[in-house]
C-alpha cells in the first residue's frame, strides 16, 4: 500500500517523535490525525499487549469541549444517554445520533464540571454537529477543540507502570472514572479506560509540550516491565467485541442495532428519539453479532455480504485471524432471522465464499 503523504491536513501528534523512534510500521488517518496501526506485527503486538504493558498514541481521539451555562442542555439533546446520573468524576459512553436515529459517533464523555464536558471522539467530525445545534437553539455554550491529546497505557502491567509515574492513587481509580493527577506540576485527567480489554488508563494530556516528556517518563519507568510502544490492535479488538465506528457501525445503523440499547435511557426529548421509538419498543430487525469464519480469509477492507439460501442476511464489518483462539474472529450486523447462536450461513469475501457460524458472544 502507498504511504501517507505528509500534509497539514493530516496532523502529527505530540507523541509522533516517540512513535517513530519506536519503529512504527503503519498508520491510518483518524480524525485528520495519524494513528499508529502496527509496530512489530499485528500478531506480535497483540501477544505483547496481553502479557505486558504498552503505551499508545491515541491523540487522534480528539476532544470536543462543551462549556457554558447550556452545556448540559446540549449534551442531553445530542445523546440518548441519561446525563443526569453522571457523577462528577465519571466517564460516560454516549452514542450520538441524528434525527433519524442513525449513529453519528460513539464518544466517551468526561464530566469536568457541571457546565463543562469533553467528548472524546471516535472517527468523525462531531464538533460541527454540536456547534450547529448550539447555534440553531441559541445555547449559551462554547464549543472548541482543545489542545488535549490522550495517551493510553494498556495491558496487565498498566497499574504498575502508572503508579511509578503518577503515584499509588492510580490504583484506586475505578472503571470509567478519573482522577486529576500531577505530572511535572500540571494536573492531568487520568481515567481507567481504553480501547482494549486488557486493562489500563487513558491520560488526557493538556498541552502538546507535555507529550514527549510524559512519553519518555513512562518508558524510563517501565524498562523492567517490558514496556513497548503499541496501538489499538485489531485482533484483540475483534476478540473483545469493541466496535469500530466506520467499520462495524455507521450512520445507517441505530444504537439498538449496535447492541447499545442500554445507553438509550434518557427521559429527555433528544434528537432522534421519535425515530428510535419503534426499536425501543420492539427491538431492531438486525444487530451486531460475534461470528466465526472458516477457512483462510484476506484482510477485511470492505463490508462482506452474509448470505443464506442466496439471500443477503447481513454483513461482516471486521474479520481477522486470532492466534489465541485459533479461528477467524469477526463482527457482523446480522438480520434477526439468522442471529441466533449456532446459526450457519456464508460470507462472500474477495477470495470466495466462506462458512460462518454465529457465536453466543465475543471471546472476552
From Swiss-Prot:
Induction of the gene: By dimethylsulfoniopropionate (DMSP) and acrylate.
Disruption phenotype: Loss of DMSP demethylation to MMPA. 25-fold increased sensitivity to acrylate, growth is strongly inhibited by 20 mM dimethylsulfoniopropionate (DMSP). Disruption of this gene has a polar effect on acuI, the downstream gene, which accounts for the increased sensitivity. Dimethyl sulfide (DMS) production is enhanced.
GO biological-process terms attached to the record: methylation
UniProt EC number: 2.1.1.269
A Pfam family: GCV_T
InterPro entries linked to this entry: GCST_C (IPR013977), GCV_T_N (IPR006222), GcvT/YgfZ/DmdA (IPR028896), GcvT/YgfZ_C (IPR029043), TrmE/GcvT_dom1 (IPR027266)
GO molecular-function terms, A-Z: methyltransferase activity
Keyword Nuclease: no
Catalytic activity as recorded in UniProt: S,S-dimethyl-beta-propiothetin + (6S)-5,6,7,8-tetrahydrofolate = 3-(methylsulfanyl)propanoate + (6S)-5-methyl-5,6,7,8-tetrahydrofolate + H(+)
Keyword field: Methyltransferase, Transferase
pH dependence as annotated: Optimum pH is 7.0-8.0.
Family of this protein: Belongs to the GcvT family. DmdA subfamily.
NCBIfam families documented for this protein: PRK12486.1 (NF009133)
Any further remark recorded for this protein: DMSP is used as an intracellular osmolyte, predator deterrent and antioxidant.
Function according to Swiss-Prot or TrEMBL: Involved in the assimilation of dimethylsulphoniopropionate (DMSP), an important compound in the fixation of carbon in marine phytoplankton, by mediating demethylation of dimethylsulfoniopropionate (DMSP) to methyl-mercaptopropionate (MMPA). The intracellular concentration of DMSP is estimated to be 70 mM.
Protein name from the UniProt record: Dimethylsulfoniopropionate demethylase DmdA
Gene, per the UniProt record: dmdA
Amino acid at each position: 500500500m502507498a504511504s501517507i503523504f505528509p500534509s497539514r491536513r493530516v496532523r502529527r501528534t505530540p507523541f509522533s517523535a516517540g512513535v517513530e523512534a519506536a519503529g512504527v510500521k503503519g498508520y491510518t488517518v483518524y480524525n485528520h490525525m495519524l494513528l499508529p496501526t502496527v509496530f512489530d506485527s499485528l500478531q506480535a503486538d497483540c501477544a505483547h499487549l496481553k502479557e505486558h504493558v504498552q503505551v499508545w498514541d491515541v491523540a487522534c481521539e480528539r476532544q470536543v469541549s462543551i462549556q457554558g451555562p447550556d452545556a448540559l442542555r446540549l449534551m442531553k439533546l445530542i445523546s440518548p444517554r441519561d446525563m443526569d446520573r453522571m457523577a462528577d468524576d465519571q466517564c460516560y459512553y454516549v452514542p450520538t445520533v441524528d434525527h433519524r436515529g442513525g449513529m453519528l459517533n460513539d464518544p466517551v464523555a468526561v464530566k469536568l464540571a457541571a457546565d463543562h464536558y469533553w467528548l472524546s471522539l471516535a472517527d468523525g467530525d462531531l464538533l460541527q454537529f454540536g456547534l450547529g445545534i448550539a447555534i440553531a437553539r441559541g445555547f449559551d455554550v462554547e464549543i472548541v477543540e482543545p489542545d488535549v491529546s490522550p495517551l493510553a497505557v494498556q495491558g496487565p502491567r498498566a497499574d504498575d507502570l502508572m503508579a511509578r509515574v503518577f503515584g499509588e492513587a492510580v490504583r484506586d481509580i475505578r472503571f470509567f472514572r478519573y482522577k486529576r493527577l500531577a505530572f511535572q506540576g500540571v494536573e492531568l485527567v487520568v481515567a481507567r479506560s481504553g480501547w482494549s480489554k486488557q486493562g489500563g488508563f487513558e491520560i488526557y494530556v493538556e498541552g502538546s509540550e507535555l507529550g514527549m516528556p510524559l512519553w519518555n517518563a513512562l518508558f524510563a519507568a517501565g524498562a523492567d516491565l517490558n514496556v513497548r510502544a503499541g496501538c489499538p490492535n485489531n485482533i484483540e479488538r475483534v476478540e473483545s467485541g469493541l466496535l469500530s465506528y466506520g467499520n462495524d457501525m455507521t450512520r445507517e445503523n441505530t444504537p439498538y442495532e449496535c447492541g447499545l440499547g442500554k445507553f438509550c435511557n434518557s427521559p429527555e426529548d433528544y434528537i432522534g428519539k421519535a425515530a428510535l421509538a419503534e426499536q425501543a419498543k420492539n427491538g431492531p430487525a438486525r444487530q451486531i453479532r460475534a461470528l466465526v469464519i472458516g477457512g483462510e480469509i484476506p484482510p477485511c477492507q470492505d463490508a462482506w455480504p452474509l448470505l443464506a439460501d442466496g439471500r443477503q442476511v447481513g454483513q461482516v464489518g471486521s474479520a481477522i485471524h486470532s492466534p489465541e483462539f485459533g479461528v477467524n474472529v469477526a463482527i457482523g450486523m446480522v438480520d434477526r432471522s439468522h442471529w441466533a447462536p449456532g446459526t450457519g450461513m456464508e460470507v462472500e469475501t474477495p477470495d470466495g465464499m466462506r462458512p460462518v457460524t454465529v457465536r453466543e458472544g465475543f471471546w472476552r
